[in-house]
């Protein structure tokens, strides 16, 4: 890439989806399987993966991706997979299956032991990257609805790799003081692009606050700012909205995102559509929160639907001008404690494509009224 070449619109980002085979529609976008396969096929030096857990062998397509990684590692490509300390259940089996892949467990909060690595992203050769809500599991690759973004624009990939370096510094095998030293080294160069300096209309946001580093944007700040500035419409497709934070088994009220949604509907007359998931991974407060939003805003233009098939898509669109794709629920525990990276864009084409996905999901036979 020439150093003074113009930045392509949308930083060459393409939307990526996993759609279960039992859905009544298909995607026009790259599949997660195709995305991961392309990253592996084109890799020449390294592939770095961050995921809460690693269970690719649970489906046939997941196993195919893992076999491709194994082949790449045997050819000398450096492969590192970051897992959360509490997501390593299948680690022994995977290590025995492929000893050339370096699996590293991380603990981003050794002091309080409440934070998890929640981020889902891949980076290869500082040239290609994926970020979204597909973890490195067979389900995310094949049987659970997910949404992410793939780019082969090197500056964006390099910026995401800096996040990988940050999470890697919290290797759970290291002593705490080594974690702090490693983090201190990588945080000052933590990002090149942010809300005030997007590249091609694209930037990343981060969580939690203690991992921000120099010039990174806190994800919750950006999300709440966008909700509070919404003028016409807010479309949300999420597994859950939970206005609480859990610490040591106790729940504490965390209304920041919840209140911003209510204020937009009641105070400013913003049209809001909320599509929530309804499956066994839901927080106990999730459906109660959805019903409370529906009840509080009964005199306003707020609609709530439930998606009946396993849906881990986490998507926010504001005023048809901004799109946010993340791996975190709108959940106080996630935003206060967990480590993740979110994708943000104001590029018109990317926002339009994300909007079409939301519209498709909203009117599909899998979306049911909350009142039914």
Curated annotation (Swiss-Prot):
Localization per Swiss-Prot or TrEMBL: Virion membrane; Host Golgi apparatus, Host trans-Golgi network; Host endoplasmic reticulum membrane
Keyword presence, Lipid metabolism: no
Triggers of expression: Expressed in the intermediate phase of the viral replicative cycle.
One GO biological process term: viral budding via host ESCRT complex
Membrane topology: Lipid-anchor
Keyword Lipoprotein in annotation: yes
Keywords noted in UniProt: Host endoplasmic reticulum, Host Golgi apparatus, Host membrane, Host-virus interaction, Hydrolase, Late protein, Lipoprotein, Membrane, Palmitate, Viral budding, Viral budding via the host ESCRT complexes, Viral envelope protein, Viral release from host cell, Virion
Domain PLD phosphodiesterase: 307-334
A Pfam family per the record: PLDc_3
Assigned EC number: 3.1.1.-, 3.1.4.4
Family, similarity comment: Belongs to the orthopoxvirus OPG057 family.
Reported function: Major envelope protein that plays a role in the biogenesis of the viral double membrane and in egress of virus from the host cell. Produces the wrapped form of virus that is required for cell-to-cell spread. Acts as a lipase with broad specificity including phospholipase C, phospholipase A, and triacylglycerol lipase activities.
Note: The mutation in position 280 confers resistance to an inhibitor of virus envelopment and release.
Summary of subunit composition and partner proteins: Interacts with protein OPG190.
Name of the protein in its database record: Envelope phospholipase OPG057
Gene, per the UniProt record: OPG057
């Amino acid at each position: 890439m020439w150093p003074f070449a113009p930045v392509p619109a949308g930083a060459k980002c393409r939307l990526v989806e996993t759609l279960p085979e039992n859905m009544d529609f298909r995607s026009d976008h790259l599949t997660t399987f195709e995305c991961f396969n392309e990253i592996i096929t084109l890799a020449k030096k390294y592939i770095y993966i961050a995921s809460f857990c690693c269970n690719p062998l649970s489906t046939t397509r997941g196993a195919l991706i893992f076999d491709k990684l194994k082949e790449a590692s045997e050819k000398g490509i450096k492969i590192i997979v970051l897992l959360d300390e509490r997501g390593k259940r299948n680690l022994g089996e995977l290590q025995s299956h492929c000893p050339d892949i370096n699996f590293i467990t991380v603990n981003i909060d050794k002091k309080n032991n409440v934070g998890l690595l929640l981020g889902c992203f891949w980076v290869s050769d500082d040239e290609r990257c994926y970020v979204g809500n597909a973890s490195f599991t067979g389900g995310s690759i094949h049987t659970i609805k997910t949404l992410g973004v793939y780019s082969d624009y090197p500056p964006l990939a390099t910026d995401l790799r800096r996040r990988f370096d940050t999470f890697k510094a919290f290797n759970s095998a290291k002593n705490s003081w080594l974690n702090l030293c490693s983090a201190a080294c990588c945080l000052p160069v933590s990002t090149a692009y942010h809300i005030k300096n997007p590249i091609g209309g694209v930037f990343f946001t981060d969580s939690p606050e203690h991992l921000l580093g120099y010039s990174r944007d806190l994800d919750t700040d950006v999300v709440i700012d966008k909700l509070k500035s919404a003028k016409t419409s807010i479309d949300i497709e999420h597994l859950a909205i939970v206005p609480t934070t859990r610490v040591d088994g106790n729940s504490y009220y965390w209304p920041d995102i919840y209140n911003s949604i209510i204020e937009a509907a009641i105070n400013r007359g913003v049209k809001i559509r909320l599509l929530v998931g309804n499956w066994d991974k839901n927080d106990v407060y999730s459906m109660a929160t959805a019903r409370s939003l529906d009840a509080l805003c009964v005199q306003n233009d707020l609609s709530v639907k439930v998606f009946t098939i396993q849906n881990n898509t986490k998507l926010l669109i504001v005023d048809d001008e901004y799109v946010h794709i993340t791996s975190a629920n709108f959940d106080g525990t996630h935003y206060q404690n967990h480590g993740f990276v979110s994708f943000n864009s104001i590029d018109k084409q990317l926002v339009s494509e994300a909007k079409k996905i939301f519209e498709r999901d909203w009117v599909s036979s899998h979306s049911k009224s909350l009142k039914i």
